[in-house]
Amino acid sequence: DSGSSRDPGASSGGC
């Protein structure tokens, strides 16, 4: 998780 601290899905590679 390095993308969004708010949205773990986005950091994980989720849409």
UniProtKB/Swiss-Prot annotation:
UniProt keyword annotation of Transcription regulation present: no
Topological relation to the membrane, as annotated: Lipid-anchor
S-12-hydroxyfarnesyl cysteine lipid attachment residues: C15
Cellular-component GO terms for this entry: plasma membrane
Cysteine-cysteine disulfides: none
Subcellular localization: Cell membrane
Keyword tags: Cell membrane, Lipoprotein, Membrane, Methylation, Pheromone, Prenylation
Modified residues (Cysteine methyl ester): C15
GO molecular function: pheromone activity
Function summary: Tremerogen A-I is produced by the a mating-type cells and induces formation of conjugation tubes in a mating-type cells.
The protein, known as: Tremerogen A-I
Classification lineage: Eukaryota, Fungi, Dikarya, Basidiomycota, Agaricomycotina
